[in-house]
Amino acid sequence: PLSEKQSGWDWFSLSLDDGVKLMGFQLRQTDGSTFSSSSWIEPDGSLTSYGNKEFVAKPLNLHTVGEKKLPTRWRLLLKDKNVDVTVKAINPNAWMNLSIPYWEGPVEISGSHSGRGYLEMTGY
């Protein structure tokens, strides 16, 4: 569950074509700030963790599903690994209007790296 000061989260789990895995998330705060963290996993299993603000997720456009406006295309940056990618929802209409509403679904990755992955978002 989110705290009273958090409005939602955006969670990315990406499998890059070179065998690397990138997991990153940001927690959106009610004051407009964010907290982010990520993990970079090499094909050999070695792990590098990144703290707040090293992983950057910026929405590029909003898609309307019902009465919700959802960011279904993102720019992700991880400067230490020269990552500058666009993440695009394969099915932008995948909003789940349940007791805790959320969006989740597969994504395509293009830019400095390519691949596929998964995105989950809440608080929209």
Where are these regions (language model features)?
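Structured soluble/peripheral alpha/beta segments that form catalytic or ligand/cofactor-binding pockets
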Residues: 1-124
